[in-house]
Regions:
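N-terminal ligand-binding lobe of clamshell/alpha-beta domains
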Residues: 1-262
Length: 262
């Protein structure tokens, strides 16, 4: 019996290398396929869109916060990989009675790399995970952006407006971009137009997910803060903490070039 610890310091015992894995977090699903688990992943969520050919082929077990528990039970997985923030606690607690559940808890690049290495070890892909972590770290080490002393409001939702606050993975990525989070609150607070005025961000990022902000929403924010730079950003680059981190540094370089240019 192999014993592991997840990122909540829970003990996970596995009698053998898992062969029937259900992943209920998009970025971690992509990671599993990147590490070569082509046949072991038997279930994913409807939001696990990468890689596309796997998204089309693998059974969907609901959404990240609305999992089909009965379907998951019927599939008889030997491991479920989840996340403290992206999944509902009540549902995960129910799944713990089905099979071992490994839960990640991501706040920054270090905890993301720890997750990648831990998951790699869990699924007998430790060497591949170590190589991936080294590649990601190397690319971030080459990301040298000036501290702009510009305040940014990173919007994740509309009606009500919600932003990414402190103590979030998104906040840690904003710091990598040399930006200061205009939100003083932790996690994902709601914000009003008046609150946005008081925060005085120099830059507003409108994320592509979870709310799909589009070009048409830029004017909406320009009416509130006409002098702020309002930019659409790829939410996956700021919030996916698996193998997609490989592409984040290059994206941040290009994004910040546009921020300083405008």
């Amino acid at each position: 019996m192999a014993v592991f610890h997840d990122q909540l310091n829970r003990v996970i015992s596995l009698p053998a290398v898992p062969k029937r894995i259900i992943s209920v977090v998009p970025s971690q699903t992509e990671l599993l396929f990147y590490l070569g688990l082509d046949t072991e992943v038997i279930g994913i969520t409807k939001f696990c869109i990468h890689p596309e050919h796997k998204f089309k082929a693998v059974t969907k077990v609901g959404g990240t916060k609305q999992l089909n528990i009965n379907q998951i039970k019927a599939m008889q997985p030997d491991l479920i990989i989840a996340n403290k923030e992206e999944n509902e606690r009540r549902q995960i607690e129910e799944l713990i009675g089905v099979c071992p559940v490994w839960i990640s808890d991501i706040h920054n690049l270090d905890s993301a790399l720890d997750m990648i290495q831990s998951v790699g070890t869990l699924i007998n892909r430790g060497v591949e995970a170590k190589t991936l972590c080294a590649d990601i770290l190397s690319r971030f080490d080459k990301l040298i952006l000036p501290i702009l002393n510009q305040r940014v409001a990173y919007f994740i939702w509309r009606k009500p407006y919600m932003v990414a606050g402190r103590d979030t993975f998104i906040d840690s990525m904003l710091q990598k971009c040399g930006l200061i989070n205009a939100s003083e609150a932790d996690r994902y607070p709601e914000v009003t137009a008046q609150g946005l005025l008081l925060a005085k961000p120099d830059v507003i990022f409108l994320s592509s997910e979870p709310y799909p902000f589009r070009q048409k929403h830029i004017d909406e924010f320009k009416e509130i803060l006409p002098n702020a730079k309002v930019i659409l950003v790829d939410g996956e680059m700021f919030s996916w903490y698996g193998s997609r981190l490989l592409y984040a540094p290059a994206y941040f370089n290009e994004l910040m070039y546009n921020v300083t240019l405008n």
